[in-house]
Amino acid sequence: MKRPSGRAADQLRSIRITRNYTKHAEGSVLVEFGDTKVICTASIETGVPRFLKGQGQGWLTAEYGMLPRATGERNQREAARGKQGGRTLEIQRLIGRSLRAALDMSKLGENTLYIDCDVIQADGGTRTASITGAMVAVIDALKVLKKRGGLKGGDPVKQMIAAVSVGIYQGEPVLDLDYLEDSAAETDLNVVMTDAGGFIEVQGTAEGAPFHADELNAMLALAHDGVRQLFELQRAALAD
């Protein structure tokens, strides 16, 4: 089996995490997984949704979108269509769920973190890149909130999270699929993990033949190794 990119089966694409990418957001990151590029911002607003008012805890919610020409052919903006597509809703819910699992909401105070992930170029793995980049943006935003005196109960970050795709391509498990691989893969998994090795979410679909337990275990092992490398890159970015 030869991957279109020439990478080894267990090799990530070139990953870059650039902090403070935009001027106004409390936290902002440009995250690049190969040719996939996503701007992730974390904005802080005082107040929480109605169902949380008076409970002394915060909230995090996420939105996801793609520029019209992030892909090979132009797609109409969802705003122009008047509604978000099912894929968009699924991905932004995944991003929100994953990031909430990283935080202790009781330490946020009654503040809301708004996460915006905007894909400026897509070449596979946009949701996993979004989660990985947004985690760094969240940490930067929380530093700003702390300086403002908005954190009363210590650091809300319980654990780091990152995400990566794995799949079965030409009969073999591979890590971090690009678009060419993703579109031809027999199986595609998106895996969100903590830096302690726990799983937050595993999304998997067999596009062709069903996959078996040994293949699933092989893919999860690849994901574990890939996410470990992503945590190292996140920490290196935060140390700059």
Curated annotation (Swiss-Prot):
Give the GO terms filed under biological process for this record.
Answer: rRNA catabolic process; rRNA processing; tRNA processing
Q: Which UniProt keywords apply?
A: Nucleotidyltransferase, RNA-binding, rRNA processing, Transferase, tRNA processing, tRNA-binding
Q: Which EC class heads this enzyme's classification? A: transferase
List the InterPro entries.
Answer: ExoRNase_PH_dom1 (IPR001247), ExoRNase_PH_dom2 (IPR015847), ExoRNase_PH_dom2_sf (IPR036345), PNPase/RNase_PH_dom_sf (IPR027408), Ribosomal_Su5_D2-typ_SF (IPR020568), RNase_PH (IPR050080), RNase_PH_bac-type (IPR002381), RNase_PH_CS (IPR018336)
What is the catalytic activity of this protein? tRNA(n+1) + phosphate = tRNA(n) + a ribonucleoside 5'-diphosphate
Q: Name one GO molecular function term.
A: tRNA binding
**Which amino acid positions bind phosphate, per UniProt?**
R87, G125, T126, R127
Q: Does the keyword tRNA-binding apply?
A: yes
> What EC designation does it have?
2.7.7.56
Q: Which Gene3D superfamilies match?
A: GHMP Kinase, N-terminal domain (3.30.230.70)
State a single Pfam family of this protein.
Answer: RNase_PH_C
Complex and partners: Homohexameric ring arranged as a trimer of dimers.
> What role is this protein assigned?
Phosphorolytic 3'-5' exoribonuclease that plays an important role in tRNA 3'-end maturation. Removes nucleotide residues following the 3'-CCA terminus of tRNAs; can also add nucleotides to the ends of RNA molecules by using nucleoside diphosphates as substrates, but this may not be physiologically important. Probably plays a role in initiation of 16S rRNA degradation (leading to ribosome degradation) during starvation.
Please name the NCBIfam families in this protein's record: RNasePH (TIGR01966)
> Which family does the UniProt entry place this protein in?
Belongs to the RNase PH family.
Which protein is depicted?
Answer: Ribonuclease PH
The gene name on file is rph
